[in-house]
Amino acid sequence: MRKVFLAGNWKMHYTSVEAADVAKQIVDGVYNINNNVVVMVTPTFTSLCKVCRVTKGTNVLLGAQNMSYENSGARTSEIAPSMLLEFGVDYVILGHSECRTYLGENDEIINKKVLTGLKHPFKYLILCVGETLEEREKGKTLDVVLNQVRNGLASVYESDLQRIILAYEPVWAIGTGKTATKEEAQEVHKAIRLEIQSLYSKSAADNIIIQYGGSVNVDNVEGLMGENDIDGALIGGSSLKADSFLKIINKISK
């Protein structure tokens, strides 16, 4: 049985002091959480130092929102994997739609980051994929998403998939209040799992974690998580307040 991975993505919110305070509330709130649920928080780079002091030694994993595929050098504004590991980062989000849109990241760059991440001792790498509203309306959802999966995992060995989490995040549902119906999400998640089976094996497909991201909240999370191929959520706005994030966690772990 696959575990449920609930990751809060705090994006560009909170000072380091504010982030540490929210993280402390979450850590305290999940002290006795069901072992089948994995809780993750992803603050800004500038908050990692303070938040890691809160999450260290707890059952809450600490993540980063991006990283460079280079380990050092003339990469102004970027951050290296070793720098993240210094702050106890457990996982990194790669290929988020906002990075694709605002930072110009493409599949080739994202794949380089995946391959670099696998060379470092992160517990997990979250590879995000998803289609725009225009692509969905043209009936291209599966073509776009599965192509991103293939490109993102290029040259990744099956033995490394245990450290890869896939996150389907329809771009049109991120921060808009719109959410794919559980049936729409399940259709894509099932297709992704079948693609993993085609690329690797049935065992790999059965075991890989596939999160859903896109305006997840306490009202829709239970329905989404009830689908066969949805194994967790990458949560934005509803993870910014400890009480709303804890309500989501408690609803799934009850």
Curated annotation (Swiss-Prot):
Catalytic reaction(s) noted: D-glyceraldehyde 3-phosphate = dihydroxyacetone phosphate
InterPro entries membership: Aldolase_TIM, TIM_sf, TrioseP_Isoase_bac/euk, Triosephosphate_isomerase, Triosephosphate_isomerase_AS
Pathway: Carbohydrate biosynthesis; gluconeogenesis; Carbohydrate degradation; glycolysis; D-glyceraldehyde 3-phosphate from glycerone phosphate: step 1/1
MF terms in GO: triose-phosphate isomerase activity
GO biological process: gluconeogenesis; glyceraldehyde-3-phosphate biosynthetic process; glycerol catabolic process; glycolytic process
Subcellular location per the Swiss-Prot or TrEMBL entry: Cytoplasm
Annotated EC: 5.3.1.1
Source superkingdom: Bacteria
Annotated residues for binding of substrate: 9-11, 175, 215, 236-237
Catalytic center residues: 96, 169
Statement: the UniProt record of this protein carries the keyword Oxidoreductase: no
Subcellular location, principal: cytoplasm
Keywords assigned: Cytoplasm, Gluconeogenesis, Glycolysis, Isomerase
Gene Ontology terms: cellular component: cytosol
Subunit structure as annotated in this protein's UniProt entry: Homodimer.
PANTHER family for the chain: TRIOSEPHOSPHATE ISOMERASE (PTHR21139:SF42)
Family note: Belongs to the triosephosphate isomerase family.
NCBIfam families: tim
Biological function: Involved in the gluconeogenesis. Catalyzes stereospecifically the conversion of dihydroxyacetone phosphate (DHAP) to D-glyceraldehyde-3-phosphate (G3P).
Protein name: Triosephosphate isomerase
Organism: Borrelia recurrentis (strain A1)
Name of encoding gene: tpiA
